[in-house]
Amino acid sequence: MPQNYLYVITGKRFSNGDIQSERLGNHSGSIDIGFEFEFKRVKVFLYRQNFYEAGALAHFANIQDGLNGLRLENMQATNDLVFWRRILFEVLYTKNQAGEPWSPPTPTQCENYYNHGQYFNGWSYQGNSLGTPLITVRNDAREDLPSHPRDYFINNRLLAFHFGSEGSVHGYGYVVRASWSKNFGTYRTTDEEQSTGITDAGDYGIFNVQKQLSAYFELNKHLNNSVGMAFIGAYDYGTLLYNSFGLFLKASYSFNI
């Protein structure tokens, strides 16, 4: 196995004497922990995800950031006219990024989630983030929002609440999803006190606080074993994204092979 590959997968620093000690490749991801409890009527799943990217988590410098979730699953078989199958609550916080005045010092700068010093489009693929869609790329946000030219993700400091549910009402299946967020831009577009070392913070404008609501609703019905119909509606309202809505009518057919 090539030595460089071992350095990549372990995150160990590499130096051959001619170049400075660096980690090879990029190491972005999350550390997950979860607990599942199964009762007679409901199954409960609690989980927490922490970001890691530039090494701040090893110093507990961005331990405040992460995703907290609670999922409830109905374990009862029922013929009730109203039946919930799953319910989900999530809270996402990404404001810290090891850049708060009280954040423990680290060998690297703040995390600046999904942005990159060399890749103009950061950690994205075909214009979309490789992680949570709540961290906003430049092309999705309103054009009048302040942004630093080095940031492809112009909003990565946020507090968001998400709710989801699916079940049935009078024989019709339903899916509901809604996210509400307060968005604070990046450390380059804030006037908040910080320990990031950024020298031009606020030079390209102040992002302030932008609030956003995004919602999705689906009502579906199986007409028989093969044919299904669904009505779908989606809505964006707020000051981060442009206001928009859409209505869809979906028909599906399942083949038995």
Name each model feature, range by range.
Residues M1-Q20:
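Acidic/polar loop-and-plug regions of large Gram-negative outer-membrane beta-barrel proteins
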Residues I19-I257:
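Outer-membrane beta-barrel pore domains
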